């Protein structure tokens, strides 16, 4: 597994249980997990991972609102060049993405307690 694949899996993991925003949750959680692996992650890597997940049908983007309609599915990857001031754009896993997430990832770096597996390593390509 290379760095890009790892970031994609970590991002997918973050959007499997709820709609999540890049700047509110995804970036912070993935950066925290990546640090356990000895990596510093940039926000742009998260955005790239989300674009790839959407392109491959593993995730979708939504606009969420406290007013009807409460959620609006967006087509494709929205531009997220800057941090959102009002946190309107969220991401959620698709059925295909959930199937991937639930599959047995031998390359997932963490054990069931969230600790880095001693046999895990990142491929340098």
What are these regions (language model features)?
Residues 16, 58, 102:
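Residue-level marker of positions within ordered structural domains that often coincide
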Residues 19, 62, 90-92:
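Sequence-level detector for tyrosine residue identity
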Residues 36, 60, 95-96:
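Context-gated lysine
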Residues 67-125:
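Short, amphipathic alpha-helical interaction segments positioned at domain boundaries
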């Amino acid at each position: 597994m290379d760095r890009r694949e790892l970031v994609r899996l970590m991002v997918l993991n973050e959007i499997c249980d709820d709609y999540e925003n890049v700047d509110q949750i995804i970036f912070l959680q993935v950066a925290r997990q990546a640090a356990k692996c000895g990596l510093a992650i940039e926000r742009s890597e998260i955005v790239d991972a989300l674009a790839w997940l959407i392109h491959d049908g593993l995730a979708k983007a939504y606009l969420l609102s406290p007013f009807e309609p409460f959620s609006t599915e967006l087509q494709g990857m929205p531009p997220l060049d800057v941090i959102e001031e009002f946190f309107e754009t969220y991401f959620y896993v698709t059925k295909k993405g959930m199937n991937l997430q639930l599959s047995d990832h031998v390359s997932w770096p963490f054990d069931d307690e969230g600790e880095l597996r001693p046999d895990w390593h990142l491929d340098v390509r």
